[in-house]
Structure formats: C-alpha cells, structure tokens
C-alpha cells in the first residue's frame, strides 16, 4: 500500500509532512499557535531533512515566516474573511527541487487558460443529469471513479475508509449523476476561520468527457458554498494539464501563482497552479 504523508493537527493549526511529497506543508495556521508551529517545523526539518517547506500564512505573519531563504510563490487577496491576504511561502532545502524546468510550458498553459492564446474548443453537448451533495452511501462509487481517473494522487481519496473519515471530519463531496450513475465528483474543504474553501478532487468519468460536466459541477459547488456565506474559493491544481486550468479560468477564477515541484504525481514532482475567486 502506498505510504501517504501524515496530517498532524497542532493546536488550531494543521501540518502535513512526509516523504511521499518530500516536504512539509503548513496547511493552516492560527495566530495562537505561532510558537508551537515554529518549534514543530524546526524539529521536523531537523529530523527528516525534507526537500521543501511550503507555508500558507496570513499577511500579518509575513515578517515571521518570510526569511531570506524563503520565496513567495503565490498570494490570494482577501483569503482570510475577505480582508487579509494569504501568502504561500516556500523554502527549498534541496536546490534541485527549485529548478523550474517546465516554466515555459506552464506559462503557455496559463496564457491559453486566460484566453490570451486561442485554441480550438470542442462543442459541448446538452446533457440531462442530477447534481447533489454526496452521502456515505456514495463513498464506494466515488472511490471507484477516482481510481479510474487518477493513477496516483497526493491523498488516498481512492480508499473508502479515508473518504469516509474526511467526510466525517467535515469535507463535503458533491456528485453528478446520469441515469443514477455517478459520473463526476468534487470536494469542498471549508476553512471556517478564513471563510475560504478549497475546491478540489474534481473528476469526470472518461466516458463522459467533453460534455462540460466539470464546469457544471464546479458551478453547483460554488452555489452551495455561497449559501454558507463562504467568501473565497480557491484551488491548487496541476500546472501542466490544460483542461483543469482552463476550467477554473473559464469560471472566472484568477491566477495567483505557481508552486514549483510541489506535489508527487506518478513518481515525479509536478508544479501546481493556484486559482482563486471571490464569492462574496
């Protein structure tokens, strides 16, 4: 079985670390935990010597975390309660991890996604389907869909036990059905402290590609988040595939930055683009 990185709650904050991605990821920090987090980051790096540390922090903590060996890879304006920016700050402890070999290709993908370079588009065929919030009864079918779409993934979303746990912990999944068959899925992970939501895990059955189902499901997920008064939506997606970047750009998300060699996918480290959208 694949060994995924560990997610550790520290006070009101959250860190992920491990050798699957060979990194430490400060996913969420609460101001009350700054001293604890500083010590934990130091201890982890001293123990494991990870190649990269990435930290998502509010602008007010920039002076603490933006040291001379740290670079800002992305920024989401008004991430915290629609007021304070979130910074994605990275330290590359292994210089080779900072080598951006795909830079030109990624920039071209961004420009195409934003409509600055024209490409031919397939016509979207009308389709009748149902979108709804997933329940525990859907877990097996969602995992089956993810196994068919993703060869590897940063989190074990193809495993029913894991999916059940994160649903119990509050992550919401949404599905699209055609003839009572789940053919698309996606997740919303709300950060109540920030009033922000990560839109993630979007997948469509290969047999139903080209019908605009991802766009429809993303729009539905956004509407559900607006009803909860969430202020900002964002995604961290693979930087090189055109479809997922064009999906978010087409849904009026703004490009925020690129996390270089951030995530292990199919045995290599890939860069990830960040897109965000103000919902309220």
Regions found by a protein language model. Give the residues of each.
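Conserved active-site tyrosine of GNAT-family acetyltransferases
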Residues: 64-67, 89, 247-248
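Conserved GNAT acetyl-CoA-binding A-motif
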Residues: 45-57, 225-237
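N-terminal charged segments
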Residues: 1-48, 62-63, 83
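Short amphipathic alpha-helix that is part of the acyltransferase structural core
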Residues: 20-27, 103-108, 112-156, 274
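A conserved beta-strand-loop-helix scaffold within acyl/acetyltransferase catalytic domains
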Residues: 6-23, 141-206
């Amino acid at each position: 079985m694949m060994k995924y990185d560990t997610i550790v709650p520290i006070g009101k904050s959250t860190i992920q670390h491990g050798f699957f991605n060979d990194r430490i990821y400060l996913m969420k920090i609460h101001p009350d935990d700054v001293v604890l987090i500083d010590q934990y980051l130091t201890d982890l790096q001293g123990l494991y010597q990870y190649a990269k540390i990435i930290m998502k922090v509010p602008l007010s903590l920039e002076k603490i975390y933006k040291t001379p060996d740290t670079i800002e890879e992305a920024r989401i304006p008004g991430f915290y309660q629609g007021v304070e920016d979130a910074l994605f700050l990275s330290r590359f402890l292994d210089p080779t991890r900072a080598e951006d070999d795909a830079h030109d290709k990624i920039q071209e993908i961004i420009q195409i996604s934003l409509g600055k370079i024209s490409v031919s588009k397939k016509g979207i065929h009308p389709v009748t389907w149902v979108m709804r919030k997933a329940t525990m009864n859907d877990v097996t079918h969602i995992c089956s869909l993810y196994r068919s779409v993703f060869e590897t993934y940063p989190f074990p979303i193809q495993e029913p036990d894991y999916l059940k746990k994160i649903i119990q912990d509050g992550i919401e999944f949404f599905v699209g059905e055609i003839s009572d068959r789940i053919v698309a899925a996606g997740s919303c992970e709300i950060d109540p402290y920030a009033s922000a939501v990560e839109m993630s895990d979007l997948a469509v059955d290969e047999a139903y590609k080209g019908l605009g189902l991802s766009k429809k499901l993303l729009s539905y997920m956004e509407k559900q988040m607006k009803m909860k008064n969430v202020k900002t939506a964002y995604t961290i997606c693979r930087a090189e595939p055109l479809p997922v970047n064009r999906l978010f750009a087409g849904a009026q998300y703004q490009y925020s930055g690129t996390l270089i060699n951030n995530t292990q996918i199919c045995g290599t480290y890939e860069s990830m683009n960040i897109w965000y959208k103000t919902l309220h």
